[in-house]
Amino acid sequence: MRSITAILSVFVLLLVCFSASGAAVENTNPVLNFEVISSDWAPFALPVYGDVRQGETDYYTYYVPSGATTLEVSLTWDVSNGDALRLLVHPPTGASSSFGDGMDGTINGKIAVRTSIPVTMTASNWRFDVIGLTVDDVTSYTLKINSY
């Protein structure tokens, strides 16, 4: 029993330390609490395909309908050549939230987040920025946005 408790204690300590290390998530919006998701859970979203170069930003607008309570966003790309992208989420009011690869504990070319939507932020446009942080020439990506 002691060994199981010790193993669990070490696991929790590592989880807390790993979660605190690195600034992959910068949520400056006190109203929205984003949850990191480790699977590609957005099969019903119509994907948006794009290409981005180093220092370039692609902008997307998404209308969140009235009555929606949840927002899910997924950004995926190929990291085999070391390309790094960043996702910025701009709600209709308040500060934006910034997300980078590795939030789920793995550098895998995937940023996937979910948040509850306050009723005051529905029936409005949200903006999503895909930023080429470190890109060798050009990298292709897929962006999926769902609200329900």
Task: Please place each PLM-identified region on the residue numbering.
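Acidic, Ser/Thr/Pro-rich low-complexity intrinsically disordered segments
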Residues: 51-102, 122-124
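Non-catalytic extracellular/lumenal accessory regions of secreted precursors
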Residues: 22-70, 146-148
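Secretory targeting signatures
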Residues: 1-28, 128
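Serine/proline-rich low-complexity intrinsically disordered segments, especially terminal tails, linkers
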Residues: 5, 11, 21-23, 40, ...
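Noncatalytic accessory or regulatory domains flanking protease catalytic cores in secreted, cell-surface
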Residues: 86-148
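Intrinsically disordered, low-complexity segments enriched in Ser/Pro/Gly/Ala and basic residues
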Residues: 2, 8, 18-20, 37-38, ...
